[in-house]
Design a protein with these regions (language model features):
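N-terminal FAD cofactor-binding segment of flavoenzymes
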Residues: 5, 12-59, 161, 336
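Helix-loop-beta segment of a Rossmann-like dinucleotide-binding subdomain
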Residues: 61-82, 118, 213-219
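FAD/FMN-dependent oxidoreductases across multiple families
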Residues: 192-196, 205, 224-303, 316-332, ...
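Alpha-helix N-cap/helix-initiation motif
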Residues: 74-78, 82, 116-117, 149, ...
């Protein structure tokens, strides 16, 4: 918008963020340089200063608790609530001249001579030189544009999340942190009853985000006929969890499909008049002890914007012109990190990680 390009965001929710779900952690270090002042004053919940990992057995567990003064000195990562964060970010964009249209669902793409020329939302037709598809892991826009590879249940997981409200002082005491400081805690093992996946907990200012993620293929094939919501209920009843959330009030319940294909699950990133970003492009990385995605989405959005600015200057929105987008991403942490960890999905496909070990 600052480059005198009209930008329209079509949002199907009541407001930006109302339909978005995340575990709750944004790694800001990788995007600090490219984001500039974009995140200045952002409504972060807590700076993550403690890392915890737990292996859960049937009635027992073992864990690792790691903290470092470096975490306190540097803005490495933060817990966030998407409904708050995305709404704030949208307000900043509108101040810069971006049009945000809420309560509209994009139903189809508009085409002209084999090129994506806009979107259809209800009875409205919105024409554009470039459509940036940021419609999530199942991206029907990417599919309609012929950019999404044929995916299988193996490439997806489903996440169940709850937000439990607790007073700030109780969170500080129970998690041994000071105000403004937070904990990221990941769980493996009995939390998914031996299925591919795990559990998570992130502390917010006055709430805790916790949930379970389990592979879609594992759910379909499990002989125990366990459902994701049942895993969530059992997770909350474990001693390791119930003592941390005791007395809390459930304020939000959500579910979300998550890309698990890694580098091999990345879509074709651009075509004539269209670019895919974030989950729609498959930009997510599960390394077992670390789960990343939001910083990939932000970085890909920035690279998409730079590509469109160059395309506008050349008045060329063809697939060849927009291919600069992938070239730019290869020079950033997004495709570099995904390529470095490209064997991780196969590595984590070993069932022993979630039961025997």
């Amino acid at each position: 918008a600052e480059k005198d390009i009209q930008v329209i965001v079509v949002e199907r929710g009541d407001f930006p963020g109302s339909k978005n779900v995340t575990g709750g952690r944004l790694y800001t270090m990788p995007i600090k340089t490219m984001a500039g002042d974009m995140l200045e004053g952002a409504p972060f919940e807590r700076k993550i200063v403690r890392e915890r990992w737990s292996l859960l057995g049937d009635g027992n567990s073992i864990g690792i608790d790691f903290t470092s003064e470096k975490f306190r000195k540097e803005d490495h990562s933060f817990s966030i609530l998407r409904a708050t964060f995305d709404r704030w970010l949208a307000d900043r964009l509108m101040e810069k001249g971006v049009f945000v249209i809420p309560k509209y669902r994009v139903d189809d793409l508009l085409w002209e001579d084999g090129t994506v020329a806009g979107v259809k939302a209800g009875q409205e037709e919105i024409y554009a030189h470039v459509v940036v598809a940021a419609d999530g892991v199942l991206s029907f826009m990417g599919e309609k544009a012929g950019l999404k590879p044929k995916m299988t249940p193996h490439n997806y997981a489903v996440g169940i999340k709850e937000i439990i409200e607790l007073p700030e002082d109780k969170i500080n005491d129970r998690f041994n942190v000071e105000s403004g400081e937070g904990v990221a805690h990941l769980f493996l093992g009995d939390v998914t009853k031996g299925l591919f996946g795990g559990g998570f907990l992130y502390t917010n200012k006055e709430s805790v985000s916790l949930g379970v993620v389990v592979g879609v293929k594992a759910l379909m094939e499990n002989k125990q006929n366990i459902e994701a919501h049942a895993l969530m209920d059992m997770f909350k009843e474990r001693y390791e969890l119930r003592t941390l959330i005791a007395g809390g009030r459930l304020s939000e319940y959500a579910a979300h499909v998550i890309p698990e294909g890694g580098y091999g699950g990345i879509s074709k990133l651009s075509g004539n008049g269209i670019i895919l970003t974030g989950d729609a492009a498959g930009f997510a990385l599960n390394m077992g002890v670390t789960v990343r995605g939001m910083e990939f989405a932000i970085a890909s959005g920035i690279m998409a914007a730079e590509t469109i600015i160059q395309a506008k200057e050349a008045n060329d929105f063809s697939e060849k012109s927009l291919a600069r987008y992938e070239t730019k991403l290869k020079e950033t942490f997004v495709l570099k990190d995904l390529a470095t960890s490209k064997t991780m999905p196969e590595f984590l496909d070993n069932e022993s990680f979630f039961n025997f070990y």
